[in-house]
Structure formats: structure tokens, C-alpha cells
């Protein structure tokens, strides 16, 4: 299963938040700031937008998400070392689930 973290943030100059949060899977950052730009590497994508609001940011993240399993999170989350395994196994145990809260 393909896991993608969808993370909303503000005024991030780079993608260092990914390392700070201990995210090891694919990640999409929606960065609310004063410019409209995009950045992509092998596992990190960052869309900088002038749109404001957490709901707008999360909706944009869902629109551009590519993961089979998507995790919406805040920019102050720190992920456990085995989060990918735990989440993927939960969806394997509950194949009909659309949403699982952790």
C-alpha cells in the first residue's frame, strides 16, 4: 500500500519540516505563504499557495494527493518510527474502511 502524509503549514522556506516531523513516507506539504510555487523531489512535494485557511489547505492537499492511503496531519506532529507499518496493517485488517483514526 502506498502511504502519503498530507501536511498543512505556513511560511515554510524549505522542506525541513519533513525531517523535523520524522516523516519517512511520501509527503505533500501545502504551504500557505505569499507566493504560488511548486517543488517536487522523489518523495516530497510542496505546493506553496497564497490561499489561506486550514480547510482550504487540507482540501487542496486532498485534491493533489496521490497516495492510496492519505494521512491529514498538523505541522506540529512527530511521527513514530514505525508509523507506516502500523497504518498500512490497520488498513489491511479493515479493507472496507474509508477512514481510520489513530
Where in the sequence are the language-model features?
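Conserved donor NDP-sugar-binding/catalytic core segment of glycosyltransferases
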Residues: 82-102
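Active-site regions of enzymes building and remodeling cell-envelope glycoconjugates
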Residues: 23-29, 39-50
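Acidic helix N-cap motif at the loop->helix transition within catalytic regions
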Residues: 15-18, 35-45, 82
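The conserved acidic donor/metal-binding loop of glycosyltransferases
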Residues: 74-78
Amino acid at each position: 500500500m502506498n502511504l502519503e502524509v498530507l501536511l498543512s503549514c505556513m511560511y515554510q522556506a524549505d522542506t525541513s519540516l519533513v525531517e523535523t516531523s520524522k516523516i519517512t513516507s511520501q509527503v505533500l506539504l501545502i504551504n500557505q505563504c505569499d507566493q504560488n510555487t511548486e517543488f517536487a523531489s522523489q518523495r516530497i512535494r510542496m505546493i506553496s499557495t497564497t490561499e489561506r485557511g486550514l480547510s482550504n489547505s487540507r482540501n487542496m492537499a486532498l485534491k493533489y494527493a496521490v497516495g492510496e492511503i492519505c494521512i491529514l496531519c498538523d505541522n506540529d506532529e512527530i511521527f513514530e518510527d514505525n508509523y507506516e507499518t502500523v497504518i498500512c496493517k490497520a488498513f489491511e485488517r479493515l479493507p472496507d474502511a474509508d477512514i481510520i483514526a489513530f
